[in-house]
Regions:
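Short, conserved loop/helix-junction motifs that constitute active-site signature segments
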Residues: 24-30, 116, 136-139
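Conserved beta-sheet core of the metallophosphoesterase superfamily
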Residues: 123, 128-206, 215
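Solvent-exposed loop/turn segments at secondary-structure junctions
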Residues: 8-11, 39-43, 75-77, 91-94, ...
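Membrane-embedded segments
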Residues: 1-68
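Beta-strand-turn-beta hairpins that frame and shape the catalytic cleft
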Residues: 67-68, 74-87, 178-184, 210, ...
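Active-site neighborhood of phospho(di)ester-bond hydrolases with catalytic His/Asp-centered motifs
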Residues: 1-7, 32-39, 70-73, 123-126, ...
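Acidic/histidine-rich helix-loop elements
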Residues: 8-16, 42-53, 94-103, 157-169, ...
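Binuclear metal-dependent hydrolase catalytic cores centered on His/Asp/Glu-rich metal-binding motifs
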Residues: 45-67, 79-122, 132-133, 198
Length: 221
């Protein structure tokens, strides 16, 4: 299955969505696709006063595709006998604001999805890696994040030059971040941010293999 974690479009005035739609159409005709929003999709939908009707038209078109759109939804599926719960988080916009980290992300997750079922593998699509500690505390087995696009220029495996909220050298631009049996995987992504620049920052497609163990613990390697 294919998990799409958002920012398939670039949310700016006059943005076009045809390429994003074409990509999702081709992908969903071949694979089962689960698609959660990034902040770019979220803002073109929530702010028509800035972006016009492009967000509304984009969402209507995507709804016609053979994929599952996860806007604060969770679905249960089974793959090769392994029970999975896939959650797509679209948080309150304040969690994308610049400045200090906002309180209440765990409560946001509980409000949207309840508590993770310990008898299932819970996969969380949560675009913003700044709240990785909260995702780990909530208890998702694996959380997929992006948002930083590798921080423009990568400095090692995790640290980038700058984040979208203008923090210098953030430590969550890539890599795997673990806590016990839980992991957050941050991808540098396939595209660019609003400014199309990548330095020592190759495009990244994450492939995850989940194997069932008898005790149902699912370590990420």
């Amino acid at each position: 299955l294919v998990l799409v974690g958002g920012d398939v479009v670039v949310g700016k005035k006059g943005c076009e969505t045809e390429k994003a739609f074409g990509f999702l159409k081709k992908l969903s005709e071949t694979y089962p696709v689960y698609y959660a929003s990034g902040n770019h999709e979220q803002r073109i939908v929530e702010h028509p006063e800035i972006y016009g009707e492009v967000g509304k038209r984009y969402e209507a078109a995507v709804e016609e595709l053979p994929l599952l759109r996860l806007r604060n939804r969770k679905v249960q599926v089974e793959k090769k006998g392994i029970p999975l719960t896939i959650c797509g988080l679209e948080p309150d916009e304040r969690f994308y604001e610049k400045g200090r980290r906002k309180e209440g992300m765990v409560e946001e997750l509980e409000k949207r999805f309840g508590q993770p079922d310990r008898d299932r593998i819970t996969i969380l699509l949560a675009h913003n890696p700044r709240y990785k500690k909260e995702y780990l505390s909530w208890g998702a087995t694996v959380t997929f994040c992006g948002h930083y696009h590798g921080g423009v220029m990568m400095l090692g495996k995790r640290r980038g030059a700058i984040s979208p909220d203008f923090r210098i050298f953030p430590a969550e631009c890539g890599g795997i971040h673990k806590k016990g049996e839980h992991a957050v995987i941050v991808s540098a992504g396939l595209g660019e941010h609003t400014i199309p620049l990548r330095i020592h920052n190759p495009r990244e497609l994450t492939i995850l293999r989940i194997c069932a163990l008898q005790n149902r613990k699912m370590p990420v390697k």
